[in-house]
Amino acid sequence: MASTFSFDIVSDFDWQELVNAVDQTGREIKARYDLKDTQTALELTKEGLTIHTDSEFTLNSVQTILQQKAAKRQLSLKIFDYGPVEAAGGQRVKQLIKLRRGIPSELAKEISKLIRNEFKKVQASIQGDVVRVSAKSKDDLQAVIQRLKTQDYPVPLQFTNYR
């Protein structure tokens, strides 16, 4: 039997599910009567998603469709970091939506501090964009998970690598 148990706190998403959500959004834009002639383009890169469209109103409609498709595919809406709306020549607008992946160092420190303050028998260590939590008791680890689920963080948290 292991002397200590641990798990990792990560913030990640399924890339293929995001690709599918963007693809479904594009199909709905082409099929919807109010968006059909807007010449809306979605461009997905590793850095983020760029939306090119005719107006800010259309941009808001596309964002709503994207959020619906992402939610149906079990993607957290917290992965989207909406940038400013920019003019793209003529009356067209564009917006870059950055994709959040990994736990930022400030947030990792905040999570680690919360764990240290509330759970004396649990150790938390920051390893890059992952927080490793370890303890001698599985019950303590489950209490940490329950406590973190009650918090509202700007990134979605997943608990992986149970040992």
From Swiss-Prot:
Gene3D superfamilies per the UniProt record, alphabetical: 3.30.70.860, YajQ-like, domain 2 (3.30.70.990)
Protein name: Nucleotide-binding protein tll0793
Any single GO CC term annotated in Swiss-Prot or TrEMBL for this entry: cytosol
InterPro entries in alphabetical order: DUF520, UPF0234-like_C, UPF0234_N, YajQ-like_sf
One of the record's GO molecular function terms: nucleotide binding
Family assignment from sequence similarity: Belongs to the YajQ family.
Alphabetic keyword roster: Nucleotide-binding
Annotated function: Nucleotide-binding protein.
Keyword Transmembrane among record annotations: no
Keyword Nucleotide-binding: yes
